UniProtKB/Swiss-Prot annotation:
Protein origin, superkingdom: Eukaryota
GO biological process, one term: signal transduction
InterPro entries, alphabetized: SCRL
Signal peptide per UniProt: 1-26
Name of the protein described by the UniProt record: Defensin-like protein 232
Gene it is expressed from: SCRL23
Alphabetized Pfam families for the sequence: SCRL
Expressing tissues: Flower buds.
SS bond partners: 33-94, 43-68, 51-84, 66-86
Family per record: Belongs to the DEFL family.
Main location: secreted
Subcellular location: Secreted
A cellular component annotation (GO) from this entry: extracellular region
Keyword Transcription regulation: no
Length: 95
């Protein structure tokens, strides 16, 4: 009886160890991929939607969420510009 119990316990422990090794070998998923591009014009009231459309057409990839930030004008810039920062859907295609 002891021998059978010992074999069963060692089998369970072996299975647990093997599953932990497989999980660690798979590696961590890639970190989020954010891209930021400068566009002409201001963000406006619907800046996030505007950035979403501009970034998808520019990157030719789906994006998950965006933020829009107007560039402050100084003496060197005469036109309105804004930065669009968006998170790409597929972090494996991050450049």
């Amino acid at each position: 009886m002891r021998c059978t119990t010992l074999i069963m316990v060692s089998f369970v422990v072996s299975c647990l160890l093997l599953s932990l090794v497989e999980e660690s070998e798979a590696g961590a998923p890639p970190v989020e991929c954010w891209s930021e591009i400068l566009f002409s014009g201001k963000c406006g009231f619907h800046g996030k939607k505007k950035c979403y459309k501009e970034m998808e057409s520019k990157l030719k990839q789906r994006v998950l969420k965006c933020r829009c930030e107007d560039v402050k004008k100084d003496s060197n810039t005469s036109k309105d510009e804004h930065y669009c920062g968006c998170q790409r859907e597929n972090p494996y295609e991050c450049n």
